[in-house]
Amino acid sequence: MATIVSPPHFSPVEDAENIKAACQGWGTNENAIISILGHRNLFQRKLIRQAYQEIYHEDLIHQLKSELSGNFERAICLWVLDPPERDALLANLALQKPIPDYKVLVEIACMRSPEDMLAARRAYRCLYKHSLEEDLASRTIGDIRRLLVAMVSAYKYDGEEIDEMLAQSEAAILHDEILGKAVDHEETIRVLSTRSSMQLSAIFNRYKDIYGTSITKDLLNHPTNEYLSALRAAIRCIKNPTRYYAKVLRNSINTVGTDEDALNRVIVTRAEKDLTNITGLYFKRNNVSLDQAIAKETSGDYKAFLLALLGHGKQL
């Protein structure tokens, strides 16, 4: 369930004009911008961006970048982007880090529908003039390269049909490779990159039924490396997305210095989907609400915007 609260009736032209007015004069009226964009759903934001372009012959995101700064600017621009553009940007930023953040790629590959993943790849090529697969291949080697390239490039079945016999046989394949009985990880990569989320969940359940332990616990017995870290993230993301995201949020807030990139990514990408469930589990596991944690660890306009996406603040 979504956390964002948006009005049923609104005027994209009026919103565009109010945003322009907020950006004029001696100082930017950040509160006005938050009260508009922090309370508009995806469809409404698209119309506002179109209206802004038609009226002022300027991209709204360019305007926001020129007027705002810091974590607030990064979060609100991420929010205004269409989802395929957003995923392309997140993937590119993750790959450009000194140590690439492979878990961002895993999240995108695991949590998007085949159509959404294809749209993100198209947006990536449009924005950066080369493919996501090419950039992944140039920044990775070995098993981590094979896993990530396969996951982002696959167009998987997205239905609910499950083959229980296949789940049992492929649970055995994963078990053999995880325990080191196989020569390489090709079969694990094949299973993760070609099976639907429903089929993978069935495989993971059969794994635990047959071998008495979860696949993620067995993976913890191996020395940590990039490939196994990404593999664990993929499995956790597929098995229980709510738990996965609640943990990402906890880690982003509990680190020495808040990890704003992770905080932005989860709140912005899940606010219109399942953030209510994520915040509920966050509270159960941490004995503090996500709202309270954000209010404590962030400040100013950035804090106000994140809280708006969580359903707080006044609408304009």
Curated annotation (Swiss-Prot):
PANTHER family named among the record's database cross-references: ANNEXIN, ANNEXIN D8
Modification Phosphotyrosine, positions: Y128, Y155, Y282
GO biological process, one term: defense response to bacterium
Regulation: induction: Up-regulated by dehydration and salt stresses.
Swiss-Prot/TrEMBL domain comment: A pair of annexin repeats may form one binding site for calcium and phospholipid.
Family statement drawn from the similarity comment of this UniProt entry: Belongs to the annexin (TC 1.A.31.1) family.
Protein name: Annexin D8
Organism: Arabidopsis thaliana (Mouse-ear cress)
Residues annotated to bind Ca(2+) 2: I253, G257
InterPro entries named in the record: Annexin (IPR001464), Annexin_repeat (IPR018502), Annexin_repeat_CS (IPR018252), Annexin_sf (IPR037104), AnnexinD_plant (IPR009118)
Positions bound to Ca(2+) 1: G25, G27, E67
Keywords, comma-separated and alphabetical: Acetylation, Annexin, Calcium, Calcium/phospholipid-binding, Metal-binding, Phosphoprotein, Repeat
Modified residues (N-acetylalanine): A2
PROSITE patterns per record: ANNEXIN_1, ANNEXIN_2
Annexin repeats: 10-81, 82-153, 165-236, 240-311
Binding site for Ca(2+) 3: T298
GO terms, molecular function: calcium ion binding; calcium-dependent phospholipid binding
Pfam family, one: Annexin
